[in-house]
A protein has these predicted regions:
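A membrane-topology feature that recognizes alpha-helical transmembrane segments
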Residues: 1-82, 87-181
Length: 181
């Protein structure tokens, strides 16, 4: 199983690099990794269990990992907080790692993003302005319509999540490093 975890970190590493350089995570990478994970887990299940049932168990666990790991990112995408490539990358990581390890990598990725984003904003000198606008967005629904503070879309900050996803996948691999391959 460790080989699948390493593959997930490698896919996340390539995605982080392309996301940092271009702002996009390519479909060939995410969907290719997702498809390869399904096929590889099917054949790995057959090899380990010496039966078709083992293959379908591996395939099912891989598909479940993709779905489970895409749920929270899909909600964030629906709310306009992340891009579609991030969802597909989380799904590919879930398919490669299965649900539990995929969710572990996802949790580490969101923790990394929660640490990196404020540091990045502070480096650019935008931290306190962004925090003020964020507070206004949180408080606005509780204000009267005439007292609401509008935030123009051009002042909203966008954060590339790919590097944080790589950090999450790498930490997950390190946490499982001593396990059986």
């Amino acid at each position: 199983m460790l080989y699948f975890l390493i593959a997930a970190a490698a896919v996340a590493g390539v995605a982080a690099w392309t996301d940092a350089k271009t702002g996009h995570i390519p479909n060939w990478l995410t969907l290719g990794a997702l498809g390869a994970a399904l096929v590889a887990h099917f054949f790995a299940g057959i090899a380990f269990a010496h039966s078709w049932r083992g293959g379908f168990t591996g395939l099912g666990a891989s598909a479940a990992g993709a779905v489970v790991c895409a749920l929270v990112p899909a909600f964030f995408y629906w709310r306009g907080a992340i891009g579609g490539g991030d969802i597909k990358l989380f799904a590919a990581i879930g398919a490669l790692c299965h649900p539990m390890d995929g969710l572990e990598a996802e949790t580490y990725a969101f923790i990394a993003a929660a640490l990196i984003a404020p540091a990045q904003l502070a480096y650019k000198g935008l931290l306190f302005q962004t925090l003020g606008r964020s507070l206004a967005l949180v408080v606005n629904p509780f204000r009267k319509a005439e007292n609401r503070k509008e935030t123009p879309p051009e002042l909203m900050t966008w954060f590339r999540l790919g590097p944080s996803i790589f950090v999450g996948a790498a930490v997950m691999v390190l946490m499982h490093w001593g396990e059986q391959p």
